[in-house]
């Protein structure tokens, strides 16, 4: 079976078992800052397992795209060198949220794997593990399914602590957890390795293909396991692994999904060895990089973009090892789209964008190699001893993308070595950070848990009545909040908008007779709206009725800005292109901030075009229309989804100007575009590689901004004794006068340096056929001394020059050696000695070097080193 057929068969099997087929979620986890990338099928259902979210179904099945790069499940450096490590993979899964449990999950797995209608794997090839004390699962396997005891393995706590086992899964130190049962395929005695639990289990003979996790306990901070009222099931089967089994190969790189990618990679690079580990690296990395970019990640120096950049550069480095010349990586995207574009349409839709991002990053990598060389030169100039420290090697590798083997080559040329152990310690520290980032990072038992949903009244107005259904103080549920206490109030219905989609939460107050609660912010937990604030008067009790009043002026100002972001988004796609994707936003009552994907600064004429388009839509004063519909219908209408937002089965579609702007949005907006009044961009800049940010104001704030700019123009005109009408002419004349004076100053400096050079050259002494000049020139900076050394080298011919001086209490040193002497004498070595004499450091090229220090009293001694340096070197 082909991989695509296996994927479809799995999903169809579980649909027939009453499961809802759910699309793969984005690789960027929605509203979950604790997780770097989606790395398991259960990630999108996390809130369902935690009891924070209720869905219309209790059974689900997915084929989830996953990335594991550097986290606890994967080491990036292993990819390409083992049969099964990948940065990107598909996880097939079936899930039960308080519906079926162990018996059904086990029978489903066995039926799909061994049923003649499905995968039809030989039963005698399958081994099963269970947690050591999970007698229930063991009995189901042996007594009901019929797996013989000799192919059953109980796995205990094999990781040094209670419940620390390959067969016990936990969401964190506390919270949902439970035993798991894993199914292994035996590739046969021709492959080395032993069954699970044996000393040889790390071999390739017995391969895990399916894991069923049974979440049946809630572990509290004291380590006690409490049975969950509604146990759940989370399963995962790697598509690549099961494809290898069904296609009778022992390496994932031999399956159909990879064969065309390996061929395309070899063609793009121009190499013939299609079994080289480096080629497998490239074929693997094009998948993770392309899917990450399609889901909105762009290369940068932090967070998700940083991981993407590392993967791209690793692919480029391995391509270069195979002989690639110029950019090649982006050329493989077409083959990936042909292989996986039908299953994941976002690849087809984003193909041009993905190729452009990869090509730009490849070109940038070539430049960073040059930057890395410069940084290495600086570090070598300060090096004491013959070993380059591990932290320096790691900095070059991690920050500048500088290959470790290249650092090693340079070190060898200079008779140096690198601290490999220190580098590995830095790498392990990074892996620990990645492992930490892959955990959920929260105490399940400290979460504010609210059953049910809050009915939102805010689309109809800014006030309404509600009943208190829950109160919280310091995250703990309470029956009452007293005057002066801070806490959270949950109502059965509310006009307060809860922060989401970039729009801040509403503020205002809740009141009843003799009671007032000042609402400072409103957030959401599951479907409940949480009103954060303080009891200003009286006390609040669960069950009490209150009147909820939103600050209308703040709500209206926020609505202007939110509606303007929709118009701006549409205008950006018109002016810059369809590759523009929203990367984030902040909308409050003061301004709007909109982050989006684009690869260069926006030109002034483009900014003007954006303002013109948005303001034209405002002047059209069209009605802002909303419609409740299902997600598929909304997408069919071309509605754009908000970056990082989770949507239910029913969504709210917001349209402006007919089809000018159509987006999914649950925020609060104006009634007509004319309500916005005026739109003015206040700034545009870059916030990360490939991500730009526009900030703008609307309505009264836009008018105030323009009035302020007018006042600044008047003040500037007054400073140059002009008016608004002739301000540009006045400024132009002033700048021209300044340039003229700067030119005169440079000419005077050049004359002074030339005169000084004539005087100094006469002071040079001859040592073994070389002119040696050491001189003190106080008050000159490094730039002036460099120019003077260049001039003296031309005047003296075969020469060694060391100039130094005191400037602002510090020592400045410059050394120069003419090219005909650099084979015997190096300026960098002379500088190291001279700088050390004044308590500093220095270094540079063989023909020119700079340095400095703090001990000006030793400057004359440092300059005297020049003659001894030449005498010893020649």
From Swiss-Prot:
Chief place where the protein resides: cytoplasm
UniProt cross-references to InterPro entries, sorted A to Z: aa-tRNA-synth_II/BPL/LPL, Ala-tRNA-lgiase_IIc, Ala-tRNA-ligase_IIc_anticod-bd, Ala-tRNA-synth_IIc_core, Ala-tRNA-synth_IIc_N, Ala-tRNA_ligase, Ala_tRNA_ligase_euk/bac, DHHA1_dom
Coiled-coil positions: none
Cofactor requirements of the protein: Zn(2+)
Any Pfam family: tRNA_SAD
Catalysed reaction, written as an equation: tRNA(Ala) + L-alanine + ATP = L-alanyl-tRNA(Ala) + AMP + diphosphate
An MF annotation (GO) of this entry: aminoacyl-tRNA deacylase activity
SUPFAM superfamilies per the UniProt record, alphabetical: Class II aaRS and biotin synthetases, Putative anticodon-binding domain of alanyl-tRNA synthetase (AlaRS), ThrRS/AlaRS common domain, Translation proteins
Binding-site list for Zn(2+): 562, 566, 665, 669
Claim: Cell cycle is one of the keywords in the record: no
EC number of this enzyme: 6.1.1.7
UniProt KW keywords: Aminoacyl-tRNA synthetase, ATP-binding, Cytoplasm, Ligase, Metal-binding, Nucleotide-binding, Protein biosynthesis, RNA-binding, tRNA-binding, Zinc
GO terms for cellular component: cytosol
Subcellular location: Cytoplasm
Top-tier EC class: ligase
Cofactor mode of binding and number, as noted: Binds 1 zinc ion per subunit.
Domain of life per record: Bacteria
Family that this chain belongs to: Belongs to the class-II aminoacyl-tRNA synthetase family.
Entry note about domains: Consists of three domains; the N-terminal catalytic domain, the editing domain and the C-terminal C-Ala domain. The editing domain removes incorrectly charged amino acids, while the C-Ala domain, along with tRNA(Ala), serves as a bridge to cooperatively bring together the editing and aminoacylation centers thus stimulating deacylation of misacylated tRNAs.
Purpose: Catalyzes the attachment of alanine to tRNA(Ala) in a two-step reaction: alanine is first activated by ATP to form Ala-AMP and then transferred to the acceptor end of tRNA(Ala). Also edits incorrectly charged Ser-tRNA(Ala) and Gly-tRNA(Ala) via its editing domain.
Name by which UniProt lists this protein: Alanine--tRNA ligase
Organism: Pseudomonas paraeruginosa (strain DSM 24068 / PA7)
